[in-house]
Amino acid sequence: MSVKAYFELVRIHNVIGSAISVFMGYVVASEWKIVPIKLILAMIVVSVIAAGGYIINDVFDIEIDKINKPNRPLPSGRIKISRARSLSIVLFLVGIVLSVLLNIYAFIIALLTVLALYYYAKDLKKQGLVGNLIVALTSALSAFYGGLAFFEGSWVIRTLIPTLYIFFFTLTREFVKGIEDVKGDMTNGVKTLAVRVGIEKTWFISKIILVILIVTSFIPYFFGFNIIYLIGILFLDIILILVVLLRHDIESASKARAYMKVYALGTLILFALGTLPI
């Protein structure tokens, strides 16, 4: 049993990304008027629930991962399934209990998110588009949760733009992931978009959404975001076009999805910096 295996199991880089998303949502909603206890608590709630979600997903996904990702902690035997299942339950419970300390709405969203993550891993993932929508929604809720933790003034309006952006970007990334995993998904009956309509059409749909996101990525600047956001998003968009939009095969999917993670993290940072009073 190694700490590294558990970090890999919970996808620690994704968990950190979720925490950053909460931070971004909070500072965008509050315009950097930070109440540390609220922010830290919200980041912990989202992080532990996200970690629990990644674990339970691997528990239910072990047969697919034996084909697609045999070196993951569970299919490789580095961590026992029973231990992973127990850890996911503990993390879910910790997140739900801590959410009560924020407000009733934070508790409700935390509870619904846990249920969504569990049933996504258990059944809904195999439904393809429905599963993709759940992943996109729960990812976007990380940013929304940051605004919810602030819960003052026009927090909903201020948090809505990054929340919607994260939703559609994550949805596209899930489509690309389906291209990467198409072989194992076909074997295990997972009805992803790539399995249903083919790789070429899935790439086309993904690129259409990305083009729309690129075109609309400048809108926040006209709603008060600063010049840091404008310059940064222009740079990220150019790289996105070169790395993702010009690719179209399975081999490219892995590289494209890897950059999309970097792009998503960069966008979160830019949303936060874009609300700095300069």
Swiss-Prot record:
One Pfam family per UniProt: UbiA
This protein's UniProt keywords: Cell membrane, Lipid biosynthesis, Lipid metabolism, Magnesium, Membrane, Phospholipid biosynthesis, Phospholipid metabolism, Transferase, Transmembrane, Transmembrane helix
GO CC terms: plasma membrane
Catalytic activity: sn-3-O-(geranylgeranyl)glycerol 1-phosphate + (2E,6E,10E)-geranylgeranyl diphosphate = 2,3-bis-O-(geranylgeranyl)-sn-glycerol 1-phosphate + diphosphate
Co-factor(s): Mg(2+)
Gene Ontology molecular function: any one: magnesium ion binding
A Gene Ontology biological process term: glycerophospholipid biosynthetic process
Residue ranges crossing the lipid bilayer per the database entry: 15-35, 36-56, 89-109, 133-153, 159-179, 203-223, 225-245, 258-278
Cellular localization per UniProt: Cell membrane
Family membership: Belongs to the UbiA prenyltransferase family. DGGGP synthase subfamily.
Protein known as: Digeranylgeranylglyceryl phosphate synthase
